[in-house]
């Protein structure tokens, strides 16, 4: 199973917020997912990002590939740096 960490759209029209989820890459964007690891709300000022670091690092170690947007969010929160430290 090819696993990705990606954003799942929530909210109403023009008021979107997202959940960071681990999902099979073959499933639809808002379809079934394996585990929820955080959320992202771009409409607040400044944008709100919360990530469960333990879960995110666990999935990255298991080979889950983050999408481009999720990768940038993980960099901002410092999770990607912690993951790279643990790899060395």
From Swiss-Prot:
Q: Name one GO cellular component term.
A: small ribosomal subunit
* Biological processes per GO annotation: translation
Question: Where does the chain cross the membrane?
Answer: none
Pfam families of this UniProt entry?
Ribosomal_S16 (PF00886)
Query: What is the name attached to this protein's record?
Result: Small ribosomal subunit protein bS16
Does the keyword Lipoprotein feature in the UniProt annotation? no
Q: Which NCBIfam families match?
A: S16
One GO molecular function term of this record is:
structural constituent of ribosome
Mind telling me which InterPro entries this protein's record contains? Ribosomal_bS16 (IPR000307), Ribosomal_bS16_dom_sf (IPR023803)
Query: SUPFAM superfamilies, per this entry?
Result: Ribosomal protein S16
**Keyword Ribosomal protein among UniProt keywords:** yes
Q: Which family does it belong to?
A: Belongs to the bacterial ribosomal protein bS16 family.
Protein keywords: Ribonucleoprotein, Ribosomal protein
